[in-house]
Amino acid sequence: MNKFSVSGVNDGLVSPMHSFLEALMSDNTIPKTVERVALNIRSKDINSRFQPIEIQLERTSSKTPWQLRFIATFDVMVAGKPQKELSLYFNFAGCWFYHPEIKQCSLQRPEVQTLLASWLKAITHTLITQPAISIKITSVH
């Protein structure tokens, strides 16, 4: 079982976030020497409207919990060739949030916490119900 540390979220989001991360990593064994990983979540269906997601986790040693660094989602623009544009960026390490229309603000803002809770609920539902989702875990150097 993996252990996680999540900062910058209200108490009501800690347990759902731990469950979400545990579910993503449950079928994967990560070597003890790896200190940072990226989880890339994509749809296998190229016609899907599913937004690609990148989640990064970091730890100082195999004996310490994984710390959630960030969650980023991307809009995919298709005009000849696929192109990704940052949509949502929850930076837990720095405790800030970014969206292209509102720019950067505190992760602690109530409306950002509400957005994160809604996003977490929606993505968890999608991962459970959509079989055409791939999760690739790679080490980051």
Kindly give the residue locations of the regions a language model identified.
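Short N-terminal edge-element motif at the start of the domain
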Residues: 1-38
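A structural detector for beta-sheet-dominated domains
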Residues: 7, 40-42, 58, 91, ...
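Amphipathic, interaction-prone secondary-structure segments
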Residues: 26-67
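An exposed acidic His-Trp-rich patch
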Residues: 61-114
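Low-complexity intrinsically disordered segments
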Residues: 96-141
